[in-house]
From Swiss-Prot:
Inducers of expression: Expression is regulated by the sporulation transcription factor sigma E.
Keywords: Germination, Glycosidase, Hydrolase, Repeat
Catalytic residue positions: 217
Residues annotated to bind chitin: 148-149, 174-177, 218, 280-283, 406
Similarity comment text for this entry: Belongs to the glycosyl hydrolase 18 family. Chitinase class II subfamily.
Organism: Bacillus subtilis (strain 168)
Protein name: Cortical fragment-lytic enzyme
Gene (name only): sleL
Length: 431
């Protein structure tokens, strides 16, 4: 598939004609919210096999082949040119589709209230073909070792219809915040621990969960080894029951990184104990902080490269946001938090406010600024086809196990287009 960036004066019909496709195909596959008023800088995924590349100054067949993980000989063959051809700037090369590799993908779902809303159920139905796992956030562990379940309306039937594995997410949330005291009890009180693990197995059987995913955050640093031992005991029990075990890890760049979020998460131990880990590689840009990319490529790479020193690549699942933020300027610490927006909403906001979308090459993320009806300045950072492609390239380069999305309900159709175009999503079979 081709990623196209809208330029001044572009129309869908002209773009479709250029790539020998139709406006309907482009509109429907991208679910374009503004087909009659494209935004400069907006990305469009062209639904064609392979893609085209326009030669730039300094390019050679070899350098282009390296960029697209193919060979100069193959590019020469499919484009019917000589291997030693001197490429002219602007010459258009066809890049054939690369072989797909297997990947595991997960998405979190966060229901509110007493049932899963119809909108979230529909999001789960639409995403499930592209997912290995779907996780309902979350089963909240209690101080006595019991569990409070989240709404699960129709999730079992939705996942079973697409052979998607239902993930059971266990948290140390208490009063809507991660609790280190709750964590201390769960990890250190033997009676509570045994009850919790048995409750997890019983609920997994009842609801059809096959992966048990621990998202224990902001634990006390002194509970680091207690958490490791808890996971060893959980793994032994779950594996006997035919269940997988996984964990969510704070985005660390060293074993000695300081901070409440990081210190109790032992990358090496988790890599040895559990079946896979999800690295929470997002929220550099967050609602209470200054405007910036939510998951800039450099910091994401730094976390993964550290993780690779502690565990094998086939246990690492990269976390990825399905959202961005709209900040009101000027940013002031403790002021009005930024508003979460989906990639589709971001495009609509840019269109309504006549804003052009820019792209930060360092962060590999799109952004724009606008002035609202009350004359307040805003800055929006979000995701588009280019930014998610940068993450897919990182997965391929570092040979990671897969990708995990936080969270469904925020529309980003281009992600699923590119995911299915470049990867075979693994579907699990359990005995």
């Amino acid at each position: 598939m081709q990623i196209y960036v809208v330029k001044q004066g572009d129309t869908l019909s002209a773009i479709a004609s250029q790539y020998r496709t139709t406006t309907n195909d482009i509109t429907e596959t991208n679910e374009i919210p503004n087909p009659d008023s494209l935004v400069v800088g907006q990305t469009i995924v062209i639904p064609i096999a392979g893609q085209f590349y326009d030669v730039k100054r300094g390019d050679t067949l070899t350098s282009i082949a390296r960029q697209f993980n193919t060979t100069a000989a193959e590019l020469a063959r499919v484009n019917r040119i000589q291997l030693n051809t001197v490429l002219q700037i602007g010459f258009r090369l066809y890049i054939p589709p690369a072989p797909k590799r297997d990947i595991e993908s997960n998405a979190y779902l966060e229901p509110r209230g007493n049932q899963v809303s119809e909108n979230l159920q529909q999001a789960a139905r639409e995403a499930s073909p592209y997912l290995t796992y779907l996780g309902a956030f979350s089963f909240q562990a209690q101080r006595n070792g019991t569990l409070v379940a989240p709404p699960l309306t129709n999730l079992r039937s939705i996942t079973e219809s697409q052979n998607t594995t239902l993930m059971m997410i266990i948290t140390n949330l208490e009063n809507q915040a991660f609790s280190d005291e709750l964590g201390r009890i769960l990890l250190n009180d033997e009676t509570v621990k045994r009850r919790l693990l048995n409750e997890i197995v019983e609920n997994a059987r009842r609801y059809g969960f096959r992966d048990i995913h621990f998202d224990f955050e902001y634990l006390r640093p002194q509970d680091r080894e207690a958490y490791n031992q808890f996971l060893r005991e959980a793994r032994d029990l779950f594996h006997r029951e035919g269940l997988e075990i996984s964990t969510a890890l704070a985005p660390k760049t060293s074993a000695t990184q300081q901070g409440r979020w990081y210190e109790a998460h032992d990358y090496r131990a988790h890599g040895e104990i559990v079946d896979f880990v999800v690295l929470m590689t997002y929220e550099w840009g967050y609602s209470g902080g200054p405007p910036q990319a939510v998951s800039p490529i450099g910091p994401v790479r730094d976390v993964i490269e550290y993780a690779l020193t502690e565990m094998p690549a086939n246990k690492i699942v990269m976390g990825q946001n399905l959202y961005g933020y709209d900040w009101t300027l000027p940013y002031t610490a403790g002021g009005t938090p930024a508003r979460a927006v989906s990639p589709q909403q971001a495009i609509v906001i840019a269109d309504q406010n006549n804003a052009s979308i820019q792209y930060d090459q360092t962060a590999q993320a799109p952004f724009f600024r606008y002035t609202d009806a009350e004359n307040r300045r805003h800055e929006v950072w979000f995701e588009d086809a280019r930014s998610i492609q940068a993450k897919f390239n990182l997965i391929k380069e570092l040979n990671l196990r897969g990708i995990s999305y936080w969270k469904l309900g925020l529309s980003f159709p281009q992600n699923w287009l590119l995911l299915s175009d470049q990867f075979n999503v693994v579907k699990k079979t359990f005995r």
